[in-house]
Amino acid sequence: MAPPYHGDTREFSMAPAKKIKAKIKKTLPVTGPQAPTVSELMHWYCMNTNTHGCRRIVVSRGRLRKFIWILLTLSAVGLILWQCAELIMSYYTASVSVTVQFQKLPFPAVTICNINPYKYSAMKEHLSELDKETKNALETLYGFSEGKSKVRRDAADWNSTGRNMQSKLLEKIPLLKFDDLFKKTATEILSGHKRKIEGSAFHQGSSMVNIGEPQDVVGFQLCDPNNSSDCAVYIFSSGVNAIQEWYKLHYMNIMAQIPLEMKVNMGYSAEDLLLTCFFDGISCDSRNFTPFHHPLYGNCYTFNSGENGTILTTSTGGSEYGLQVVLYVEEADYNPFLVTSTGAKIIVHDQDEYPFIEDIGTEIETAMATSIGMHFTRSHKLSQPYSDCTETGNDIPVANLYNKSYSLQICLHSCFQRAMVDTCGCAQYAQPLPPGAEYCNYKKYPNWMYCYYKLHEKFVKEQLGCQQICKESCSFKEWTLTTSLAQWPSSVSEDWMLRVLSWDKRQKINKMLNKTDLANLVVFYKDLNERFISENPANNLVILLSNFGGQLGLWMSCSMVCVIEIIEVFFIDSFSIVMRRRWQKMKKWWNDRKAPRPQEPPQVNAPAKEGHDNPVCTDEDLPTFNTALRLPLPQENHMPRTPPPNYSTLQLNAAFTDQLPDTLEGRSH
Amino acid sequence: MNLKKYFIRVLHRLQKGPGYTYKELLVWYCDNTNTHGPKRIIREGPKKKFIWFFLTLLFASLVFWQWGILITTYLSYSVSSSLSIGFKTMKFPAVTVCNASPFKYSKVRHLLRELDELTEAALERILQSKNRDATSALPLNSSETPSQTLNLRLWNQIPLVLIDESDPERPVIIDLFETDESGSGAQPNNSSPALVNVTSEAKKQKVAMKLCSRKALPNCIYRNFTSAAQAVTEWYILQSTSIFAKIPRNETVEMGYQPEDMILACLYGAEPCSYRNFTPIYHPDHGNCYIFNWGKDEEALFSSNPGAEFGLKLILDISQQDYIPYLTSTAGARLMLHEQRSFPFLKDLGIYAMSGTETSIGVLVDELERMGFPYSDCTMNGSDVPVKNLYNEYNTTYSIQACLRSCFQAQMFETCGCGHYLFPLPEGVSYCNSEDDPDWAYCYSSLRSSIGHRQFCIDSCKETCNDIQYKMTISMADWPSEASEEFQYMQHPLTYERDQSRNATLDRNGIIKLNIYFQEYNYRTISESAATTIVWLLSSLGGQFGFWMGGSVLCLIEFGEIIIDFLWITVIKISNWGKGLKQKRARAQYPDAPPTVSELVEAHINL
């Protein structure tokens, strides 16, 4: 092209380059990006673009047709935009895939607990008072007696035993028998005092369950010690429930004060619990079980906890190759008020998981063989932005109090415990201790029970925000259990079985075992198929782009190139044209002010018109300024593209060389 | 004719040289192609030309890159799963019922008499040892022990020993029936060190099974048991297996529970059925088993209603009094739901039903339909699995359990020379028994605990593509109810029906009621379909090409055409160049310019 310095000289006596330019402008159709007006540009764009609708608008004859084509083109554009928006919005969807793999499977951890947490014989001294009180309460309520005299022992007797605190506590939260709910009067069951109930809140059943006669209602009352008018009264439709709840309340208070080592000693040892153990055809014993102290279930034992670094695997399905244990639950040594059922509780879980045995345990009956067949399923969800789950739990603002990997339940319990420590100043007994806190007991925190009950109610009603903070974890392992029962030992084998098992037990106890003290448990893999349910992103960028391409191509035969063209033409070129025109107007206005004489019409418009009327551009594909210089199209424009080119005509001897001999000269400068 | 014309034209073209240059061709292509980029290259000024050239190249490479990704995605043969849940009329599952005890004790007593006496005596011994000083050998008190009358032949094959570990360094091994006391010469051995630690502080005395190989060197291993009960049971199972292995099949069937004794009442939907509707099958673990609705000879039954009213109701009698005392300590019926024409593997997939109860089982058919190769590594019918399915003799379909057992049996035959009693026999092989193959227990025990052999079987077997699990919701209630009238009312008619006797021979310890029915939602099917089909691939490829360059297959063909043209030009040019070279060479023979006519004439004249 013309070197830049020629432009500076155009004001004055015609430089040769200027002359050439003028000449070209006169002869050539000036369109394309260099078009003088926006409508020219649009016309050029529509004729030359690769998208399909636009050209039709220009080419069509008749207003109706033009209008229809405009409408169609616009609706096509609209459709494209709509569909692409849909595609983007559905970008974060996941598809689920289920794979089954047959392989050696890791055997899960199996945690076994006795339903009774501590040996009653060992606990007796701690609980004697409470038990006496409970017995008395039962007697008073139901006229039930154990053959003993109904005479109540007076408080002085207890005080002499030196446990003032407990009896005080018992006095503070007595069982009440409600005489009349409307008059709000109650009788203390133990002392027989009548008292007026201040609290307004009635809980646990009053709203949901229709309690028969108000005379039968039993419950207890928890008051804020600082403000005795602020009380919550818990009533139960059944005295049994009331007494059990009341017993548990006091039991937890007492247990919270006993140090851990002592509690462990009071519980069952692994040798006590396990009579025989057999895994995968090989004998095992108590050393294969890892002890674990559960606040509510005492000493529990985990088989295959992975603590020593090895996790047992199963390479054959079937009951013979699983875990077979015979448990010894000493029914005679059960706490009669705390637990009313006999047996053991087990839970199958992953080695990293905390066994929430109180929530999701399976109970094992005595004098039965319980056979538990398992199927293994692993699932994995996609985390943000696909779904609201957490991979590791690190992004949850609740500290994990359990020494295990994150789960929703751990989060909820930890969250509650944190709230408990914040509100009541001490930690609840059933959950682990946060650092720096201690378990609630009545000695130090006299109002903790009231606080706990209030807080727990809030928690259940989702007012603490725990349910909102805690997210489910993205991956989890699940063992589906099929439990079935059979009689064990069978009537004919009972005799020798019990004899030999007693021999096995001989080191610990020297007596014949009873079959109601024994439970047989078999846990095995039904088959070694591992089902893995996983979510995968349904879309990726490649697929999204090809879908875009499909949409653009379907409606308008458009592509990325067209999009760039549109940007180029509509934004850059039109902008520059508008600016140029502004500039020329300004210049004209300036010139007019300087020399108010009438002048020639501006040069620029004239050649444009000329260009349009130029016979050269009868062709629909108008050559641009640049292409015209370089690559003129063949003159027979009627069928410009169809036949293979007549290559000889592509020589540079085209139309303009003879017309503009000085072009070459000018360039050769 | 046309061909000839064409060749002539080709020849002409070759002689005349190409009618156009590379550049012309390229320009023409750019101007006329349907892909969007190239046209802009030639239509714009030099700056834009460069930009468009660059963009076109960029887009072309993007297209190829994304195509690569799409094709690899396609070749990974991923699947998408769809889940459907609901109720539909389905084939009622085949129901296999067995007794936990394989044989009636009254019928096998004569076979087991020796073994039982031996067990009884051994138990005596073990229990006696409790109060004795462990280090002293058990004296054979001839006046008390029945050992003279005992036949120790069975015992000597697989003896039980008492290992005294009061001194952990030197465990003392005492054979229960022999006075000789072997020191720590033979090492108590167990295959899994993870489970057993020999230095025990918990139990001072333990019972172990001594398994010896007599083939080569006397090589013994001791299988330790932490519990004597476990040891005695395992030992008894081994011994009895060896005894039953010698008995021909038709006799063992006779010794088991007969269908008319076991199945007292049957009702399917509203239709009565009886033990005749059950197909008998001999199962080595559980003796005679009976399969309802196996679909072998007749069409499988369909169930089109959910609920217990429309399911199968059975009353079974397991006659617990007739159990073999040492063989099975668990009493109950064993049952399993499985597909039609498949073999019931009760040890793996079966459940128990307890006597004296009514067990209700709600069924949900959980089916997984998978696509075979290349989408998943599963087998449609087991024909491509390198293990010979021994369960073919039952005319059943392939299952992974059948494959694993066949694989084990093949290995058993390879290493021990005989087949295990619990699995079907390959051709020409007999079951292991202690008389013919004295080493079999040793051999079996080592094979069973060998991880390598198991892994081999796991690797060679493949799971089936259609995996059906019957999810059961089991609930139980006491049955018949305690009210004695009702029990009498149940007991007498049932007894009368069976034995034609007025004396009640049934009791609560024997009878079981079973209800098996479909749940309200009886199927949950997860089926796979190919996530990427060829249609998907093509449309994605088209989408990519269209998105970046507005191209289509025709554009690719155009491009191919241009390349052919290019090659054609090249061929012509090369041939021309070759021709030119030849001419040059021909000219080169005369270093000077060719002589003019006058020179020639001159030369001629000069001559």
UniProtKB/Swiss-Prot annotation, chain A:
Disulfide bonds join C113-C300, C223-C231, C277-C284, C389-C474, C411-C470, C415-C466, C424-C451, C426-C440. It catalyses: Na(+)(in) = Na(+)(out). Its main location: membrane. It comes from the Eukaryota. GO terms for cellular component: apical plasma membrane; external side of plasma membrane; extracellular exosome; nucleoplasm; sodium channel complex. It is a multi-pass membrane protein. Originally identified and characterized by its inhibition by the diuretic drug amiloride. Residues 1-67, 573-669 are cytoplasmic. GO terms for molecular function: ligand-gated sodium channel activity; WW domain binding. One of its GO terms (biological process) is sodium ion transmembrane transport. Residues 592-619 are annotated as: Disordered. The keyword Repressor does not apply. Keywords: Cell membrane, Disulfide bond, Ion channel, Ion transport, Membrane, Sodium, Sodium channel, Sodium transport, Transmembrane, Transmembrane helix, Transport. The keyword Phosphoprotein does not apply. It is found in: Apical cell membrane. PROSITE patterns: ASC. The chain crosses the membrane at residues 68-88, 552-572. This is one of the three pore-forming subunits of the heterotrimeric epithelial sodium channel (ENaC), a critical regulator of sodium balance and fluid homeostasis. ENaC operates in epithelial tissues, where it mediates the electrodiffusion of sodium ions from extracellular fluid through the apical membrane of cells, with water following osmotically. Belongs to the amiloride-sensitive sodium channel (TC 1.A.6) family. SCNN1G subfamily. Component of the heterotrimeric epithelial sodium channel (ENaC) composed of an alpha/SCNN1A, a beta/SCNN1B and a gamma/SCNN1G subunit. This is Epithelial sodium channel subunit gamma. It comes from Pelodiscus sinensis (Chinese softshell turtle).
UniProtKB/Swiss-Prot annotation, chain B:
It comes from the Eukaryota. Residues 72-551 are extracellular. Residues 1-50, 573-607 are cytoplasmic. Disulfide bonds join C98-C289, C212-C220, C266-C273, C378-C465, C403-C461, C407-C457, C416-C443, C418-C432. Originally identified and characterized by its inhibition by the diuretic drug amiloride. It is found in: Apical cell membrane; Cytoplasmic vesicle membrane. The keyword Membrane applies. Keywords: Cell membrane, Cytoplasmic vesicle, Disulfide bond, Ion channel, Ion transport, Membrane, Sodium, Sodium channel, Sodium transport, Transmembrane, Transmembrane helix, Transport. GO terms for molecular function: ligand-gated sodium channel activity; WW domain binding. The chain crosses the membrane at residues 51-71, 552-572. Pfam families: ASC (PF00858). GO terms for biological process: aldosterone metabolic process; artery smooth muscle contraction; cellular response to acidic pH; cellular response to aldosterone; epithelial fluid transport; erythrocyte homeostasis; gene expression; intracellular sodium ion homeostasis. Its main location: membrane. Component of the heterotrimeric epithelial sodium channel (ENaC) composed of an alpha/SCNN1A, a beta/SCNN1B and a gamma/SCNN1G subunit. This is one of the three pore-forming subunits of the heterotrimeric epithelial sodium channel (ENaC), a critical regulator of sodium balance and fluid homeostasis. ENaC operates in epithelial tissues, where it mediates the electrodiffusion of sodium ions from extracellular fluid through the apical membrane of cells, with water following osmotically. It plays a key role in maintaining sodium homeostasis through electrogenic sodium reabsorption in the kidneys. Additionally, ENaC is essential for airway surface liquid homeostasis, which is crucial for proper mucus clearance. This is Epithelial sodium channel subunit beta. It comes from Pelodiscus sinensis.
